[in-house]
Design a protein with these regions (language model features):
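The feature captures the beta-strand-to-loop junction immediately N-terminal to the Walker
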Residues: 61-63
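Helix-to-loop junction immediately C-terminal to a conserved catalytic motif
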Residues: 76
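ABC ATPase NBD Q-loop/coupling interface
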Residues: 85-108
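Q-loop/switch helix immediately C-terminal to the Walker
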Residues: 120, 127-141
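Conserved ABC ATPase "signature" region
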Residues: 149-166
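Conserved ABC ATPase signature
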Residues: 171-175, 179
Length: 205
């Protein structure tokens, strides 16, 4: 549950594993590069806890394969977690574990309350849609179907990431990798989310 300090997000003892685990790795014995030497279970995320406060930028640092992306994708419901809890202040006033939310409520959280920028733009963009349509998809998912608003928001977002607004009808597949990443950043911001998840956001920039 969110504490009195009004954290935007609280994550407690997040677990994500591939495999059933065994007595050895469940007792938190040392692993070999996140893999149990006895049963072969891979622990992508193991007992991760942190808080995020309003206006705070929190970075998770670790070597390649240490689980940084897995944490982000778990919070965005791309992975089904093995255990742990996460409480979002904007969802049920931080009193309900979002990992226990229904699929319908998870879509609401993703569409209204969160934005996600993946390391690979292919995961966050529809490459055959125009940039404007990518933004519109996110805005419509957040229950806003006002065309004038979507047009204005498209111009605002493209200008913010220094992409010519005259290219808004072009699909991201026509853009360089860095431009694709900037379009993806804009799409994640389209619904003004209270929480923005960034997975190595500067890739290609």
């Amino acid at each position: 549950m969110i504490n009195k300090e009004e954290a935007v997000l609280q994550v407690r003892d997040l677990l994500l594993r591939y495999g059933n685990g065994c007595e050895c790795c469940r007792s938190r014995q040392p692993l070999e590069k996140n893999r149990c030497p006895r049963c072969g279970t891979v622990w992508a995320v193991r007992n991760v806890s942190f808080d995020v406060y309003p206006g705070e930028v929190l970075g998770i640092v670790g070597e390649s394969g240490s689980g940084k992306s897995s944490v982000m994708k778990s919070l965005y419901f791309d992975h089904e977690v093995t255990g742990g809890s996460a409480f979002l202040k904007q969802y049920q006033d931080g009193k309900i574990n979002i990992f226990g939310a229904s699929s319908q409520q998870r879509r609401y959280i993703k569409n209204h309350l969160m934005g996600m920028v993946y390391q690979n733009p292919l995961l966050g963009l529809r490459m055959d849609y125009s940039s404007a349509a990518n933004f519109a998809e996110k805005i419509i998912a957040a229950s806003n179907r006002n065309v004038a608003f979507m047009d204005g928001r498209t111009v605002e977002l493209l200008e913010a990431v220094e992409i010519l607004t005259s290219r808004r009808a072009e699909p991201p597949r026509n853009f360089s990798g860095g431009m694709q990443q900037r379009v993806q950043i804009s799409k994640a911001l389209a619904n003004n989310p209270g929480l923005l998840l960034l997975d190595e956001v500067t890739t290609g920039l």
